[in-house]
Amino acid sequence: MLFKRKIYDKFLAWKEETCGKKALLVEGARRTGKSTIAEEFARNEYKSYILIDFARAPEEVRDYFRLHLNDLDTFYMLLSVQYGVQLHMRESLIIFDEVQLFPKAREAIKYLVADGRYDFMETGSLISIKENVKDIVIPSEERHIKMYPMDFEEFCWALGEEPLVRYIRDCFERKIPLERSIHEKGMLIFKQYLLAGGMPMSVVAFLEGHKDFGKADLEKRDILALYRNDIMKISARYRSKVLAIFDQIPGLLSRHEKRVVFKRIAEGSTAEQYEETF
């Protein structure tokens, strides 16, 4: 199930404004839909595309980056054969998915963009993409963009409520109240959004389950488990503190001030003890 996302227009702006002179790095939390929207964009806006998922890419593909960047004709030929995709000059996109898992590919962006044959897009998860840069030169030939979960407007689009969105916007711009029954409908959908959340997979579960909040909740729990597993992969120096903060989030959000109070994380803790962790 594909959803309309606002970030698509930002992808279009990048393509038109940079004309291949910069790669696009899409950063965001896991499961916000980065890979899905990147592939949809490639499918719609290019003659062909290659998606290299570094979570699954065979070792031979990684070797292409290690051995053949000094011969880009061979590099592109090997990628084309490996993925069975014909590449077209200035009409093909190459996506480095989960690029944080193979920093060498991100470092190669400098040379690949300078070559100018194809456009490049990278996707990466926030924590890991900042961790895994110690041994590489971060390319300046990147435009960074952050991707977030679906907002309320995108949630309405997913429910097929585009007319409602247009009506709300029109009333807002004209500074007039919504008609009562439409206001009630909008508030009902907003409450559904608050309960189902904006993670694409939880929205899919909600819709495919005929608006079953239980199925959406199960999907959200799976995502939380994934986040906890990701935290366990970061530096041991920060791990326990990050987990402590992560576990405090529901309680922090339930409070009026909605800010981190360090002494509530652990008895006697201070801001200085958590500065590097943040």
Where are these regions (language model features)?
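Conserved lysine of the Walker
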Residues: 34
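Short regulatory helix/loop adjacent to the ATP-binding pocket of P-loop NTPases
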Residues: 111, 128-144, 156-161
